Amino acid sequence: MPASPQSSEMFIGLMSGTSMDGADGVLVDFSGAQPAVLAAAHTPFPAPLREAFGALQQPGDDEIHREALASNGLARVYADCVATLLRTASVTADRVAAIGAHGQTIRHRPGQYDGTGYTRQSQHPALLAELTGIDVVADFRSRDVAAGGQGAPLVPAVHAALFGAADETRVVCNIGGISNISILPAAGTGRPVTGFDCGPGNALLDDWIHRHRGTPYDDGGAWAASGKVDESLLDQMLAEPYFRALPPKSTGRDLFHPGWLQSLLDTYGNAQPQPVDIQATLATLTATAIAQDVQRYAPEARRLIVCGGGAHNDFVMTTMANQLPGVLVQTTGDFGVPVSQVEAIAFAWLARQCTRRAPGNVATVTGAAGPRVLGAIYPR
């Protein structure tokens, strides 16, 4: 007889990040000493859905209607991803305890306006539960924000479990649409895990190459590598106050969006750098923001472990390595965890924590008043 969902240790994690290219999903078994990924899948966004979420990153007309329809569309993409996972693993829905669904971030303003601020991950978890027949856990970030935190990053606890070491400080870096780092002190030092968002990851790079070459991303960073970094433009980018702000801090596409880049390019008038050189400069910005934060906040680290789509960008990876002499730059794949699966694993784990009424945040990372149970449950 299959295990009931209440006793099962199988959870699904679904992540659609700020790159807005699609949904990454994993089916994870937490019954062993280490989580075991039973299946993984990527379901691309249809072009209209990607365009809808892109438009929702900035204020516009009839937002409530457009956001509601985009949420419905995302639920259907998520449901397709779940179906692929179950089919691949030959697992039936009634054996899965819950789905941890992140949603699509369209605004992230913690601590702003009224002292509390807000974060908005657009999705329709009730529809997802209806389509899959599985309990859904969603809205992970808002409780941390309500407790005075940034609501991000939420993955450092999982980074520590998967990649922490007894004998050395390590930094785990996720390069999605936005980049973030988790600083994992050597076990026994008594120092807490910390982490924060560094700045833009792939988002501006993907937007720029799509605008000029019609491709969704810069494969391997080849286009960036063929250009020349514009040092003046890079300096202007790095003058953004966010890079000087102290942790805890978090950011998103509502700051680092195409309009942010265009406002810098407008200062050049008709003497703007060539598009390929802007791509090289954007890639260098991603690498430099990460490298500077590693040097500033984890100078003792000798290992940087990278995950997310940016791990496939050879130009970014090489630039980071050049800026961090003495630091071994690796990927999570070197530790047996594919770079595309880490965040989805994290949201499967967060769903598990929620169903057990156990905290999911790390207050030293987010700045929240303390540990909190994250997420809201939508029964199947």
Swiss-Prot record:
Disulphide connectivity of cysteines: none
GO BP term (any one): peptidoglycan turnover
Binding site for ATP: G17, T18, S19, M20, D21, G22, A23, D24
Keyword Ligase: no
SUPFAM superfamilies attached to this UniProt entry: Actin-like ATPase domain (SSF53067)
Pfam families for the chain: AnmK
HAMAP family: AnhMurNAc_kinase
Family of this protein: Belongs to the anhydro-N-acetylmuramic acid kinase family.
Protein name stated in the entry: Anhydro-N-acetylmuramic acid kinase
Organism: Cupriavidus metallidurans (strain ATCC 43123 / DSM 2839 / NBRC 102507 / CH34)
Lineage: Bacteria, Pseudomonadati, Pseudomonadota, Betaproteobacteria, Burkholderiales
Gene name for this UniProt entry: anmK
